[in-house]
């Protein structure tokens, strides 16, 4: 009987693993797509648009052409549309100050590159964004929000720091800390899930970073494994602050529909006002994914996934009671009852799941990380996705034409922005 039971268990496990692999492959392909792109595709899907839940979420009654596909050309940007980089700007910096070595990340508006400063011999991650793409999607406010948040968080150990920024006629350059331990998403892809002690360590550092942002009245709104990096020692570093919302006080709310589909909180899906507890929902979703390998309510069918988020009970197996209690608190569908609704980070910090964490030691990086990326130096790119690193570096990003003044003052930025047509026509930057 024992032999038969073990054989049956092995067959079942193998079958389930095959199914899980298929789900993971589909999941990995879909989740890098931003929410705007997802909604754009959803709006063009006649079958999906007929689904009552989709109509409720997106407030559409029939398929419609997405705004970005409108054939009418956008008018030239007015001075009010110019991007002012503010006090982070370095008016003397220019692209030719850097050797751009490798592509290490991609986003909706540009790429992140490993670069070495020629004079300083220092390595940076340089985020290069296309102004034209930003204006086309009317995302200037998000770019400014990211810049503002970056200016505020340079002293926190678990938030990426901004060194300076500059611009050319058609691009924005943000010079950031270079973090080369890899995305948490990359490590989850390789290992599928983490043991509870490792997940606890990461969750604690993430919670510390979120608590710090909340203390500055900033709601992060886009926590997901792709935005969580590991440094060379294995500590967490949050990056990508484009969806942050500033000036949200303890009881303040906002209502913008944004985020990543797998991690949207119920109140966001309902298009109700939401507060900083949306970040604690996302922390719960990420912790769940670290323990189980997929987000808590994931489905390849997006409408079904949204219905799961809104209505399906949370299912938790094979974890400790303290982990179960924490996840039930963080993934509480009613935000007024969610863990963190009353005392924000202090509630998370004092939860029994984190009883083994010395928070002073954590913030001072005195706790040895459970995983060491073992990178040999800045040029060690083993933890970056080959999808990025094998892509050629666009030649245009390192050019500093003499005819273009690199600056960040309001008037000069306006002149540079209006002159972005200097970009080579063969440039395949985006």
UniProtKB/Swiss-Prot annotation:
**Motif Nuclear localization signal mapped to chain:** 131-141
List, in alphabetical order, the Gene Ontology terms for molecular function in this entry: 3-phosphoinositide-dependent protein kinase binding; ATP binding; potassium channel regulator activity; protein kinase activity; protein serine kinase activity; protein serine/threonine kinase activity; protein serine/threonine/tyrosine kinase activity; tau protein binding
Q: Where does the chain bind ATP?
A: 104-112, 127
Q: Phosphoserine: which positions carry it?
A: 74, 78, 396, 400, 421
Q: What is the effect of changing residue 78 to A?
A: Does not affect SGK1 activation
Query: Looking at the keywords, is Cell cycle present?
Result: no
SUPFAM superfamilies attached to this UniProt entry: Protein kinase-like (PK-like)
List the induction conditions: Up-regulated by aldosterone in distal nephron (tubules) of the kidney. By dexamethasone and serum. By tumor suppressor p53 in mammary epithelial tumor cells. By FSH in granulosa cells. By injury to the central nervous system.
Sorted alphabetically, which keywords does the UniProt record give?
Apoptosis, ATP-binding, Cell membrane, Cytoplasm, Disulfide bond, Endoplasmic reticulum, Kinase, Membrane, Mitochondrion, Nucleotide-binding, Nucleus, Phosphoprotein, Serine/threonine-protein kinase, Stress response, Transferase, Ubl conjugation
Report the residue ranges that make up the Protein kinase domain in this protein.
98-354
Question: Where do the AGC-kinase C-terminal domain residues begin and end?
Answer: 355-430
Region of interest called Necessary for localization to the mitochondria, as start-end residue ranges on this chain: 1-60
Which parts of the sequence are annotated with region: Disordered? 66-92
Note the effect listed for residue 256 to D: Mimics phosphorylation; leading to basal activity
Pfam families from the xrefs? Answer: Pkinase (PF00069), Pkinase_C (PF00433)
Q: Which InterPro entries does the record associate with it?
A: AGC-kinase_C, Kinase-like_dom_sf, Pkinase_C, Prot_kinase_dom, Protein_kinase_ATP_BS, Ser/Thr_kinase_AS
What is reported on the regulation of this protein's activity? Two specific sites, one in the kinase domain (Thr-256) and the other in the C-terminal regulatory region (Ser-421), need to be phosphorylated for its full activation. Phosphorylation at Ser-396 and Ser-400 are also essential for its activity. Activated by WNK1, WNK2, WNK3 and WNK4.
Location of this chain's protein in the cell: Cytoplasm; Nucleus; Endoplasmic reticulum membrane; Cell membrane
Catalytic residues (positions) = 222 (proton acceptor)
Looking at the keywords, is ATP-binding present?
yes
Function summary: Serine/threonine-protein kinase which is involved in the regulation of a wide variety of ion channels, membrane transporters, cellular enzymes, transcription factors, neuronal excitability, cell growth, proliferation, survival, migration and apoptosis. Plays an important role in cellular stress response.
In the record, the note on similarity to other proteins reads: Belongs to the protein kinase superfamily. AGC Ser/Thr protein kinase family.
From the Swiss-Prot or TrEMBL record, give the protein name: Serine/threonine-protein kinase Sgk1
